[in-house]
From Swiss-Prot:
This is Glutamate 5-kinase. Catalyzes the transfer of a phosphate group to glutamate to form L-glutamate 5-phosphate. The lineage of its organism: Bacteria, Pseudomonadati, Pseudomonadota, Betaproteobacteria, Burkholderiales. One of its GO terms (biological process) is L-proline biosynthetic process. SUPFAM superfamilies: Carbamate kinase-like (SSF53633), PUA domain-like (SSF88697). The gene is proB. It comes from Cupriavidus metallidurans (strain ATCC 43123 / DSM 2839 / NBRC 102507 / CH34). GO terms for cellular component: cytosol.
Length: 372
C-alpha cells in the first residue's frame, strides 16, 4: 500500500491544536517551525499546499493568562481575536526562513453557504496558490457562535479541500489513526490502514471527544473524510508526532489511516450545495419521491412533498428528507416555504391556479439537486 499523497498535486493539511501548542499553553514555536520546514519541502516537489491550522484560542488563552478554556462564547471570541495575531506572526516568521509568503484567510461556514462569497473565496485561494503563497486558514471564531460551540477545523479542512478541488486532505492529530475500537479500552482493537471514506462502519468505530484544548475527536475526522470524498479527494489521518510525516507521506510511505474516495468529483455547483452545513429548511417527501430522486434521477415535484419545515426563500438550498426523517438529497428550491406549503401534494398543473403564477413545474429541478 502506497500513500495517496505521493500522487497528489494539491493538498490541504489540517494541523490540530495539540500539535501547534504547548499543551494549551500558547503556541509551540519549535513545532510550527517543523511544520513550516515540512511544507516547504513539499512545495519544493511541486505540490501546492493549503494549511488549516488550529491554535488561535489556545494562544489567546495564554496571552490573556487563562488556564482553562472558557465556556462563555464572548470570552472564546476574545481569546480567538487575541490569539490569531500570534498565530499569523509565528507562521509568517517560520515560512519566511524558506522565502515563502503566507496569507491569513479566516472563514466561516456562512462564507461558503453564499454562492457569491463561495466563488470569491475559491478565486482568492487559487490566486494565492498560483502566486506561490501558502494560505493559512482558520475559522473566524471572533464573529461566529455556533462554530465555536459545535464546529471543528476537521470539517473546515474538508470544506476547503472541496472548495479548491484538492486531491488530498491530510488530518494530523496526536493519534496514530483509526482503530476498530478504542485501543485504550479494548485490547482486541485493530488498526485500520485503509478503507473507503463514507463506509457506515467507520462512524461506529470512531468516538470519544478530543482534548480540553481542541474540540475534535476521531468521529469528526471520519465525517470530514466522508465530506472530502464527495469531491474525489482522499484523506489521510495520521499522527503529527511522526518525524517528517508530510515528507514521508509525499514519498509514498503508508502512515496512518487512508480513507479513499469511492467516487469521482461532483460538479462545482453540486459540491457547493452538498457543502451547506446550515440549511434554512427542508421538505419531507413520500416514498415514491424518494425512489424517483435516488434511483431515477428525477426532479422533485410538489406532489411528492408531504410537509414543509422551516422558512426559506426561492433560490435557497433546502434538504429533502424521507418519511423517516433521513436526508436523501438537497437542492435549490424554485419556490419559497410559504409557496411550497400551498402547492404541496398538488400536481404541477395546479401550481399556477393556486399561486397565481408559475415559476417552474418542479419544486427542485434535477440539475439543481444533489444526493447525500
Amino acid at each position: 500500500m502506497q500513500s495517496v499523497i505521493a500522487q497528489a498535486k494539491r493538498i490541504v493539511v489540517k494541523v490540530g491544536s495539540s500539535l501547534v501548542t504547548n499543551d494549551g499553553k500558547g503556541l509551540d514555536h519549535d513545532a510550527i517551525a517543523r511544520w513550516a520546514a515540512q511544507i516547504a519541502k513539499l512545495r519544493g516537489t511541486g505540490k501546492e499546499v493549503v494549511l488549516v491550522s488550529s491554535g488561535a484560542i489556545a494562544e489567546g488563552m495564554q496571552r490573556l493568562g487563562w488556564a482553562r478554556r472558557p465556556k462563555e462564547i464572548h470570552e472564546l471570541q476574545a481569546a480567538a481575536a487575541v490569539g490569531q495575531m500570534g498565530l499569523a506572526q509565528v507562521y509568517e516568521s517560520q515560512f519566511g526562513r524558506y522565502g515563502i509568503r503566507t496569507a491569513q484567510v479566516l472563514l466561516t461556514h456562512a462564507d461558503l453557504a453564499d454562492r457569491e462569497r463561495y466563488l470569491n473565496a475559491r478565486s482568492t485561494l487559487l490566486t494565492l496558490l498560483s502566486l506561490g503563497v501558502v494560505p493559512i486558514i482558520n475559522e473566524n471564531d471572533t464573529v461566529v457562535t455556533d462554530e465555536i460551540k459545535f464546529g471543528d477545523n476537521d470539517t473546515l479542512g474538508a470544506l476547503v479541500t472541496n472548495l479548491i478541488e484538492g486531491d488530498a486532505l491530510v488530518i494530523l492529530t496526536d493519534q496514530r489513526g483509526l482503530y476498530t475500537a478504542d485501543p485504550r479500552k479494548d485490547p482486541n482493537a485493530e488498526f485500520v490502514h485503509e478503507a473507503l471514506a463514507g463506509t457506515p462502519e467507520l462512524e461506529a468505530m470512531a468516538g470519544g471527544a478530543g482534548s480540553s484544548i481542541g474540540r475534535g475527536g476521531m468521529l469528526t475526522k471520519i465525517l470530514a473524510a466522508k465530506r472530502a470524498a464527495k469531491s474525489g479527494a482522499h484523506t489521510t489521518i495520521a499522527s503529527g508526532r511522526e518525524a517528517d510525516v508530510l515528507g514521508r507521506l509525499a514519498a509514498g510511505e503508508a502512515i496512518g489511516t487512508q480513507l479513499l474516495a469511492p467516487t469521482g468529483r461532483l460538479t462545482a455547483r453540486k459540491q457547493w450545495m452538498a457543502d451547506h452545513l446550515q440549511l434554512r429548511g427542508r421538505v419531507i417527501i413520500d416514498a415514491g419521491a424518494v425512489e424517483k430522486l435516488t434511483s431515477g434521477g428525477k426532479s422533485l415535484l410538489p406532489i411528492g412533498v408531504v410537509e414543509v419545515q422551516g422558512e426559506f426563500a426561492r433560490g435557497e438550498v433546502i434538504a429533502c428528507a424521507s418519511p423517516e426523517g433521513k436526508e436523501v438529497a438537497r437542492g435549490i428550491t424554485n419556490y419559497s416555504s410559504a409557496e411550497a406549503r400551498l402547492i404541496a401534494r398538488k400536481p404541477s398543473s395546479e401550481i399556477e391556479s393556486v399561486l397565481g403564477h408559475l415559476n417552474e413545474p418542479e419544486l427542485i429541478h434535477r440539475d439543481n439537486l444533489v444526493l447525500v
